[in-house]
Amino acid sequence: AGPAGLAAALVAAKSGAEVILADEDFNMGGRLNSERFSLNHQSGVDWALSTVLELQSFQNVRLMPRTTILGAFDHGIYGALERVSDHLLVPLAGKPRQILWQIYTKRSLLCAGATERPIAFENNDRPGIMLAGAMRSYANRWAVTPSQSVAIFTNNDDGHKTAIDLKALGVNIAGVVDIRLDAPDSDLYEVIAGGQVIDTNGRLGLTSITVSTPNGKTRCLTCGALGVSGGWNPNIHLTSHHRGRPVWNDDIAAFCPPIDGPAGLSVAGAALGSFTTTGALLSGAKQATEALEELGFKTKKAVLPEAEGTITKMTPFWYVEGCTRAWLDQQNDVTVKDVKLSHQENFVSVEHLKRYTTLGMATDQGKTSNMGGLAIMAELTGKTIPQVGTTIFRPPYTPTAIGAFAGRDRDEEFRPIRKTPSH
């Protein structure tokens, strides 16, 4: 429940409709909890908190934190997994670990945000290398930094946001390596425009990175952590649970929700490909208003906060050419070389690629790795990424304990003893 979800929930709450707002985080707000920009002259964190408090005041609203919508099923039914005691050191007596809810809806709105994707390069599995957005979240939300000297490798403006935020918190920025020749310059840190990270160094953790520059020379940047940003992918998984095929969007170089998604499901915010805060707020309020009016509810024009609306510029870039291993899927140890070998073995469809390499078959279902693999296969086959296509997703959206599916009919209630009339 980021800006789109909160804006949509507020519109729905004021209409009188029965509303359930589910968020997998314990603190609603989405990326607002990890950013430093303001809404209506207050921090994004404070705006999210005040909005949640307002939603709590409505009798027709049910807030469900620590709850993930894990599947979209027939007739507007959704499965929701509530984590009751996973976060507790000592679980509460008589409380389950997780609860599986079945939610029956007339209309639903997906505001699941987006997931940052990496760039593959040699030895990118060394401790200290992480996504730039995650690094920003640790710093802004938890006041934690992986190192006092950080470098950034990016193909988009969002990577620079991480450098700016870390610099403001007193972290030394060793440099921002931006693959774009027209990368924005900065007075706060050095920008290596047109550069690429070609190797990393360090025995027990990252100590430095090797960077190639446009003039053909190499440089070594000393750093204890490297933030990587290759762009963002909308979280569209639920929209494909009814076999809908994602649609490619050139503007963000990512797949967006299918036209033939689950009936009654609308999408807003970053999940729709709108990556600005202003765009997320507007799309959330708009989609909620349209859904409510279709159900016969009267709505008022949403009063939205002023927010930043700068579009993040990005140049698609998926991997750095090299000789040694560059990981795409770090959970299943799938490398760039594995995808190339798959092509050499004549496995050219995405379904064959997935099964030959196990790309995207880990518990995250390829949330960070699939796009890189598809881009490499497209390059090898001389096709575009939408021509190569993508596999679709299935429930559950996140790993779920088998016990949550057990239900209430167990033991004798599941298989009662049958007796003959003589008994």
Q: Where would I find each of the regions flagged by the language model?
A:
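Residues forming the flavin
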Residues: 1-423
